[in-house]
């Protein structure tokens, strides 16, 4: 059977792929960021919502530190666990799937599953509903 990573030989020679095994490969940081930028540029993004939700980004755009909210999201926001658009959860599914969140709501730590998702759940990689995809 052919090595599925054989085509990566040239990437390794260029120093972009650092290490590989049968299931994983480690890539150079800037190479990873450039690959992620391509993927992140294609996801649903709401510029007005993002700038409203994140006033620090809005100010950075006004000061021309970044060219747009989308540019900020692709370059920084994703890695800071910021949401690219408003994402509404299925409350019932979310609380059934994450009983620790339901317990936190009962204890008064969060008002709702939606509040949890927006404050920490998105950053923790929790899904807002079954089969969610960007």
Language model regions located:
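Charge-rich, low-complexity intrinsically disordered regions
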Residues: 2-134
């Amino acid at each position: 059977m052919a090595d599925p990573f054989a085509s990566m030989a040239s990437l390794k020679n260029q120093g972009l792929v650092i290490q590989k095994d049968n299931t994983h490969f480690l890539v150079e940081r800037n190479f990873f960021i450039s690959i992620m930028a391509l993927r992140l540029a294609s996801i649903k993004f709401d510029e007005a919502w993002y700038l409203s939700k994140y006033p620090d980004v809005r100010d950075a755009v006004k000061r021309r530190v970044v060219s747009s909210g989308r540019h900020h999201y692709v370059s920084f926001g994703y890695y800071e666990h910021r949401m690219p658009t408003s994402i509404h959860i299925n409350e019932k599914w979310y609380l059934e799937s994450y009983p620790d969140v339901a317990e936190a709501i009962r204890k008064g730590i969060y008002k709702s599953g939606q509040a949890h998702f927006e404050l920490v759940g998105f950053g923790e990689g929790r899904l807002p509903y079954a089969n969610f995809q960007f």
